[in-house]
Amino acid sequence: MTDDIFSVPCPICQKQVEWSDKSPFRPFCCKRCQLIDLGEWAAEEKAIPCESADFAMNDEQEDWRAH
């Protein structure tokens, strides 16, 4: 086993984060950055790309986008 410290940039602020049990919010540097990211997903500012947003809908499902 090596003693190399693996670190990654925080997706929000780019601060280097040690990838270990010492960093409970990894890959984020802190709870604040973690919550900012969650808020971006909740506000649909971030999304997983796909061909069409209604690919899973069929005739029996209600169109939730109209609400």
Swiss-Prot record:
One GO term (biological process): regulation of DNA-templated transcription
Gene Ontology molecular function, alphabetical: DNA topoisomerase type II (double strand cut, ATP-hydrolyzing) inhibitor activity; zinc ion binding
Gene3D superfamilies: Erythroid Transcription Factor GATA-1, subunit A
UniProt entry keywords in alphabetical sequence: Metal-binding, Zinc
Pfam families documented for this protein: YacG (PF03884)
InterPro entries registered for this protein in UniProt: DNA_gyrase_inhibitor_YacG, Znf_NHR/GATA
Cofactor note as given: Binds 1 zinc ion.
Binding site for Zn(2+): 10, 13, 29, 33
Coiled-coil residues: none
Record has tRNA processing as a keyword: no
Cofactor(s) annotated in UniProt: Zn(2+)
Record has Metal-binding as a keyword: yes
Domain of life: Bacteria
Subunit field text: Interacts with GyrB.
Known function: Inhibits all the catalytic activities of DNA gyrase by preventing its interaction with DNA. Acts by binding directly to the C-terminal domain of GyrB, which probably disrupts DNA binding by the gyrase.
Family membership: Belongs to the DNA gyrase inhibitor YacG family.
Protein name: DNA gyrase inhibitor YacG
Lineage: Bacteria, Pseudomonadati, Pseudomonadota, Gammaproteobacteria, Pasteurellales
